[in-house]
C-alpha cells in the first residue's frame, strides 16, 4: 500500500472511536443556552441541511429518521446553523453526527447542539457514541470537550475516483 501512497493513488487516514465519560461531560459542561434558541428538529427539516455530515446520508427517509432518531439544532435568524443528530442507533447506543454551517464554525455552537443531544441520550438511558477521522481536528477536540475518551485508532486508505 505504501507504493500507492507514494504515487498519490491512495490517501492514508485514521478513524478514531471514542467512549463517553459522563463525569468528564459534566466536569467540562458549559452550555450557556440563554443567548441561543436550541430546538428539537423536525425530521422533514433535517433532510434540507447541506454539508459533509448530514442526516440524509445516514437515513433513507425523514419518516425512518423520525421513528428511530433525534436531532437538535442551534437556530439563528430562524435557520439551523449547527445540528447534532443521530447518525446511527443500535440497541442502547446512539452515534452522534454534527454539521455546522461554515459561517458559524468556531463559535461553540456545535458544542451546544451536541450537549443537548447528549442530555437527551442520558434522559433516555442511551449511550452517546462518537467517531471521526483523526485529521478532523475540530471533531476530535469537540469530542474531548464533550467528555469522550479515545478508545481505538484504525488506519485506513482512501482511493479517490
Each PLM stretch: what is its role?
Residues 2-3, 111, 134-152:
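Conserved active-site alpha-helix within GNAT-family acetyltransferase domains
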Residues 63-71, 75-93, 97-102:
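A conserved beta-strand-loop-helix scaffold within acyl/acetyltransferase catalytic domains
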Residues 46-72:
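Short, conserved active-site entrance elements at the starts or edges of catalytic domains
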